[in-house]
């Protein structure tokens, strides 16, 4: 054998790391074939993979015992020496970059590059800024430049780029240039929760792709959980749908991720969306729900009161999967489950808003059949169902059963008991129940003492209620005093104790500062008890102080408008309405439509016109009272063109006005609607574009019956003379008040009577002067923007 040929069978100097199989890959393989990856199965597969690897390594080692030449041996030694030097260089670089403080600078560039290239990199990367140009580049200038760029380029950066604060005192660390997995998840969650977008938006797709995540099961659980904590359930649903809709990631779908999404939707009180996700899980073998998923959907439906849907879920829980289920490969797979105590408690929770008190007995029978023992929550929910259904005797029965079964009553149980005694009128028994709770060592909660305090205030014992408030203050995690006192004032108002409301309000000022909720409640108290001066004083104080805890909201203006309307203070009503609109709030049609109608009949027609235009500009349908009142006003003025426009609008509305309602409306306004105007309205009704609509046909029938039953020569007390021109011309809009006497010829010609200023003010009309200019018009024709402009100018003058 040649001497230059030697046998080289030694192993390399570097010991290979111990082999560790990829457990995530094993899990995905098991889920793909429908096997539940339990810890025992995973451990056995891990051992087998290690044994397989060891056998393969042994075979490769035996086969590598070959003959190498001197040149090959020298080449391998040089490669080993290079790897050693490379490892030492990495360790040295890591130790240098890890140092902080001192004069240790950052090594930039490569040793073989020129010094000019290194300096250029220093300028570009911002290293050693203080040494550049003798310190002319300062940190303050960089911060100022940052603010200028953010201000000028906000239209580019807004809702697109995350601008994070960077500490200029810290050195730039190349080792931390790229975020790790946790940082990438945090940034993605912050960006998604900061904007309302769905999976179809291009920014959403770009955010997901730029995150650099693989969207494994662990990463998806973290993302969905953190989005749920930020109350971003829409974004959580979008992430799950986008990730698992991709064909490359379909095999990565996880039941646990969908279960986490169910819990997020339940926490956000979105039962319909949760039900859709649950039905999607039922249609796929890979996502088929387990007991944890059934718990999530049951609790969500129970809190929403969807009893029928919850019972359907329980039926599906006991049935085998249908043949339409995807990925159904194992024939002997049987995921049938039986409801447990959590599911039955969810049924009781759903019975509370639906008042299904008979279902309580069925639940206890089912528990007995399945060998389940009711716990404290079961008895407490049963008591609450009976309380809301008015079965107070059964509330006490379940309380006794709870104590006899050995379950210790909790504070929430005593809260239900106190409320039941309150509704029964047993005030002393409610106080004794709370004292009994304290004697038994049950740690009370703020809700128990708050419930008892409201009970006492509702029955005129506010001084005793203050003692319960003192006990509540000593507890942890109790509600703030401002909210507590607001609830006590509301309880006293519901009990009819107005003096107690004011006494509690004065007592509250010594303990804490009233917030806007308390002020709104006092405005409600003053407004509903004819105390306009007190309400006005409090409202002026709220508006003038401009403090953070007393910022007027929509309820503030609403209660003040109600107080002004109840006291017939229409001038101040107009002032409050103007202030509300200038503050950016709009009137609630459902609550204040009747008040606007009363104000318009008192002479404040501009408010009704503004509210009507504002509602139309918002894209909503005005209240039916707005249409009918404006129609009667236009008919009385003789403005039949506007009347026809209103009729065309109301014909396309979602509501309908019957013939009886039209007739009652004309009878209600017979004092200022002439029979002649009704005749003319009936004649102009032919010009309507939607005559066949039910509302318009009912109006036509009512006008025909009204005009046919009365004489056309009959005139009301106040007649408005409207001179109509030929067809196609605009009718006169000025009210002609002429100096006439009560003669028959003037009455026949349709001329108006003359009234004094006091009589006109009483009738709710404004005296208008005759203007020869044809372009002049009264204030009712102003647009919503003109009215707002006048209000702003008047407020500036004040």
From Swiss-Prot:
Main localisation: plastid
One Gene Ontology biological process: plastid transcription
Cellular compartment(s): Plastid, Chloroplast
Taxonomy, superkingdom: Eukaryota
Alphabetical UniProt keywords: Chloroplast, Plastid, Repeat, Transit peptide
Matching InterPro entries: DG1/EMB2279-like (IPR044645), Pentatricopeptide_rpt (IPR002885), TPR-like_helical_dom_sf (IPR011990)
GO CC term, one of those recorded: chloroplast
Transmembrane helix among keywords: no
Summary of the function given for this chain in its UniProt record: Involved in the regulation of early chloroplast development and chloroplast gene expression in a SIGF-dependent manner.
Family the UniProt entry places it in: Belongs to the PPR family. P subfamily.
UniProt subunit comment: Interacts (via C-terminus) with SIGF (via N-terminus).
Protein name per UniProt: Pentatricopeptide repeat-containing protein At5g67570, chloroplastic
Organism: Arabidopsis thaliana (Mouse-ear cress)
């Amino acid at each position: 054998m040649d001497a230059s040929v030697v046998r080289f069978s030694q192993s390399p100097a570097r010991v290979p790391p111990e082999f560790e199989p990829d457990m995530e890959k094993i899990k995905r393989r098991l889920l793909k074939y429908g096997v539940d990856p339990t810890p025992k199965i995973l451990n056995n597969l891990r051992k087998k993979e290690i044994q397989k690897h060891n056998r393969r390594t042994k075979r490769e080692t035996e086969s590598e015992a070959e003959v190498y030449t001197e040149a090959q041996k020298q080449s391998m030694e040089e490669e080993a020496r290079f790897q050693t030097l490379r490892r030492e260089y990495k360790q040295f670089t890591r130790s240098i970059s890890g140092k902080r403080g001192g004069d240790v600078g950052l090594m930039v560039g490569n040793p073989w590059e020129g010094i000019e290239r290194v300096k250029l990199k220093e300028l570009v990367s911002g290293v050693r800024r203080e040494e550049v140009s003798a310190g002319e580049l300062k940190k303050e200038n960089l911060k100022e430049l940052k603010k200028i760029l953010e201000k000028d380029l906000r239209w580019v950066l807004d809702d697109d780029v995350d601008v994070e604060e960077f500490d200029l005192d810290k050195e730039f660390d190349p080792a931390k240039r790229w975020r790790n997995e946790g940082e990438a998840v945090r940034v993605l969650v912050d960006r998604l929760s900061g904007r309302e977008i769905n999976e179809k938006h291009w920014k959403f797709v770009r955010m997901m792709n730029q995150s650099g995540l693989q969207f494994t099961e662990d990463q998806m659980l973290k993302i969905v959980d953190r989005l749920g904590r930020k109350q971003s359930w829409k974004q959580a649903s979008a992430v799950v749908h986008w990730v698992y809709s991709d064909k490359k990631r379909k095999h990565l779908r996880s039941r646990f991720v969908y279960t986490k999404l169910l819990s997020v939707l339940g926490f956000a009180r979105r039962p319909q969306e949760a039900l859709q996700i649950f039905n999607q899980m039922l249609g796929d073998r890979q996502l088929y729900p387990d007991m944890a998923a059934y718990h999530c959907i049951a609790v969500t439906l129970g809190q929403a009161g969807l009893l029928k849907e919850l019972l359907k879920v329980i039926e599906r829980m006991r049935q085998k999967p249908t043949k339409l289920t995807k990925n159904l490969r194992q024939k002997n797979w049987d995921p049938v489950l039986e409801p447990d105590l959590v599911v039955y408690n969810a049924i009781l929770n759903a019975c509370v808003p639906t008042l299904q008190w008979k279902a309580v007995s069925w639940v206890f029978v089912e528990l007995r059949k399945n060998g389940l023992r009711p716990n404290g929550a079961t008895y407490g929910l049963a008591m609450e169902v009976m309380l809301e259904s008015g079965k107070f005797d059964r509330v006490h029965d379940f309380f006794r059963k709870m104590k006899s079964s050995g379950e210790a009553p909790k504070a929430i149980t005593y809260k239900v008991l106190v409320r039941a005694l309150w509704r029964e009128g047993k005030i002393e028994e409610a106080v004794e129940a709370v004292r009994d709770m304290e004697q038994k060592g049950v740690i009370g909660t703020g809700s128990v003492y708050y419930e008892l305090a409201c009970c006492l205030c509702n029955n005129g014992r506010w001084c005793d209620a203050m003692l319960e408030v003192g006990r509540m203050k000593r507890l942890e995690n109790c509600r703030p005093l401002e909210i507590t006192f607001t609830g006590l004032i509301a309880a006293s108002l519901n009990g009819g104790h107005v003096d107690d409301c004011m006494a509690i309000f004065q007592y509250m000022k010594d303990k804490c500062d009233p917030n806007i909720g308390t002020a709104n409640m006092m405005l409600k108290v003053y407004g509903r008890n004819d105390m306009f001066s007190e309400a006005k004083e409090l409202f002026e104080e709220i508006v003038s102080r401009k403090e953070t805890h007393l910022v007027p909201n929509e309820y503030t203006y609403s209660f003040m408008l109600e107080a002004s309307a109840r006291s017939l203070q229409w001038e101040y009503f107009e002032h409050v309405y103007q202030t509300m609109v200038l503050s950016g709030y709009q009137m609630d049609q459902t609550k204040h439509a009747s008040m606007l109608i009363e104000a318009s009949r008192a002479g404040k027609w501009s408010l009704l016109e503004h509210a009507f235009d504002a509602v139309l500009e918002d894209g909503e349908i005005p209240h039916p009272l707005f249409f009918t009142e404006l129609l009667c006003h236009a008919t009385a003025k003789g403005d039949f063109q506007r009347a026809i426009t209103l009729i065309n609008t109301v014909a396309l509305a979602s509501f309908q006005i019957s013939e009886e309602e039209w007739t009652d409306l004309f009878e209600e306004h017979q004092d200022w609607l002439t029979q002649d105007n009704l005749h003319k309205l009936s004649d102009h009704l032919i010009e309507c574009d939607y005559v066949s609509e039910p509302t318009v046909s009912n109006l036509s029938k009512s006008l025909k019956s009204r005009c046919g039953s009365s004489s056309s020569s009959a005139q009301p007390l106040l007649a408005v003379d409207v001179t109509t021109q030929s067809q196609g011309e605009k009718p006169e809009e000025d009210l002609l008040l002429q100096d006439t006497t009560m003669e028959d010829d003037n009455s026949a010609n349709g001329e108006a009577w003359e009234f004094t200023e006091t009589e006109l003010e009483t009738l709710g009309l404004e005296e208008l002067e005759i203007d020869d200019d044809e372009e002049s018009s009264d204030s009712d024709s102003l647009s919503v923007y003109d009215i707002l402009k006048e209000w702003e100018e008047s407020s500036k003058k004040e």
